[in-house]
């Protein structure tokens, strides 16, 4: 990713996080953290990865609510970030934190069953 793309992605991440915290009042949007943003080379498309705390149903509901708010969020981005074109945004669920927790739990389970043989 080019330096400009990285800067734009960071700016989008910062602004969307701020909007989620201060401006969106949808009760379906729970504990959301924007983990990363990927921007296309031409800066016209942005995939926004969000980590959602809660059950799988809560996660799905939150992502759906974010998708419904895409128009508002994109409009606000256009006002806050000076670009020739405001990127089309897509929200995606980032499951890497959940996977990492699962891997750590499995490693702990193996360590307990193995009786600490490699210590």
UniProtKB/Swiss-Prot annotation:
Key words of the record: Cytoplasm, Ribosome biogenesis
Q: What does this protein do?
A: One of several proteins that assist in the late maturation steps of the functional core of the 30S ribosomal subunit. Associates with free 30S ribosomal subunits (but not with 30S subunits that are part of 70S ribosomes or polysomes). Required for efficient processing of 16S rRNA. May interact with the 5'-terminal helix region of 16S rRNA.
SUPFAM superfamilies registered for this protein in UniProt: Ribosome-binding factor A, RbfA
What is the scientific name of the source organism? Answer: Pelotomaculum thermopropionicum (strain DSM 13744 / JCM 10971 / SI)
Q: What PROSITE patterns has UniProt attached to this entry?
A: RBFA (PS01319)
Listed under GO cellular component are: cytosol
The entry assigns this protein to a family as follows: Belongs to the RbfA family.
From its record, what is one biological process in GO terms? maturation of SSU-rRNA
Q: What would you give as a GO molecular function for this chain, any one?
A: ribosomal small subunit binding
Record text on subunit structure and interactions: Monomer. Binds 30S ribosomal subunits, but not 50S ribosomal subunits or 70S ribosomes.
Cell compartment(s), UniProt: Cytoplasm
Q: Which Pfam families match?
A: RBFA
Q: What is this protein called?
A: Ribosome-binding factor A
Keyword Cytoplasm included in the entry's annotation = yes
């Amino acid at each position: 990713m080019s330096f400009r793309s990285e800067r734009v992605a960071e700016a989008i991440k910062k602004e969307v996080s701020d909007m989620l915290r201060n401006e969106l009042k949808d009760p379906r949007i729970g504990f959301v953290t924007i983990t990363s943003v990927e921007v296309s080379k031409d800066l016209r498309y942005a995939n926004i990865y969000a980590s959602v705390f809660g059950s799988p149903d809560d996660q799905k509901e939150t992502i759906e609510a974010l998708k419904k708010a895409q128009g508002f969020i994109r409009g606000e981005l256009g006002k806050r970030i000076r670009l020739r074109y405001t990127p089309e945004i897509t929200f995606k669920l980032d499951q890497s934190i959940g996977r990492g927790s699962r891997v750590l739990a499995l490693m702990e389970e193996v360590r307990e069953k193995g009786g600490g043989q490699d210590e």
